[in-house]
């Protein structure tokens, strides 16, 4: 019994053994080669960050997920990164300091204080690619196409691409900002789970049910392209800003040249893992997984360059999750 305790790993942490360790390494190399050949520069950000600078405009949210401790050398608080995409945005804004379009890619370990409810994992290997300084729809299209190509290159078949718009969700949730942070988080959680019963319970004491009905509408607005037209009716009270989000999704779909093997799914109530996205959001699934293998979206303004919000879009994937579903002979 004592010997088992000596080598037991922390909850939510695993180690890679043969042959899986080599399989993951081969997939990692394949991704780096794909990204570099596509015009992205490879970076290796540090595992540790100063807590006070972690996350930029999303500092508080990232800190919720980060393991933090005091540095005995300096006395400052340090955090283990829970996400690499925000590190890429820091490198773009403060190390590269370019007004031009910058494309960065990475593969590395991330550790989260909060355990994933799906994978029960707090430590994984995150791979991704980001585009900075380009606010065009072309950048969104490129990011989505590269995400799909990434998964296909890793031997995943039967992909479904899910599209949503964080701006649309934000417009609806803005109507509940007077409820306090805790209740707002509960509403976000209920929306992400599409739990109409929880939304009704959380808002049972509200006399004006119009806002509740909008939230419930978001829960139900998923499916094929027809969802966009239905949303124009169900969400028309939100005004022109919401219509612009829907128009953008319509234009984006037309611009995407999707492989016939990739199914398209709209989910207008989708909420990503981190809440710093503020434009189009996207994710990729396979039926056998039951959860997204890759997520991404637009997150303009996470960092600022010369006090000007820096446009950004990108995606990341969980390499340890992907290796379980690859069809490659590795």
Question: Model-derived features: where do they sit?
Answer:
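General N-terminal leader/first-domain-start detector
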Residues: 1-12, 173-174, 182, 189-190
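TRNA-binding/sensing appendages of the translation machinery
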Residues: 1-81, 86, 141
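Positively charged, Gly/Ser-enriched RNA/tRNA-binding surfaces
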Residues: 20-38, 49-50, 85-98, 104-157, ...
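Residue-level detector of short coil/turn "hinge" positions at structural boundaries
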Residues: 42, 158, 180-181, 260
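General small-molecule cofactor/ligand-binding pocket signal
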Residues: 43, 162, 265-267
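Beta-rich nucleic-acid/ligand-interaction surfaces
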Residues: 45-64, 164-174, 270-278
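Acidic, His- and aromatic-enriched active-site or binding-groove loops in soluble protein domains
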Residues: 65-73, 178-201
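Extended alpha-helical scaffolds
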Residues: 154-170, 179, 186
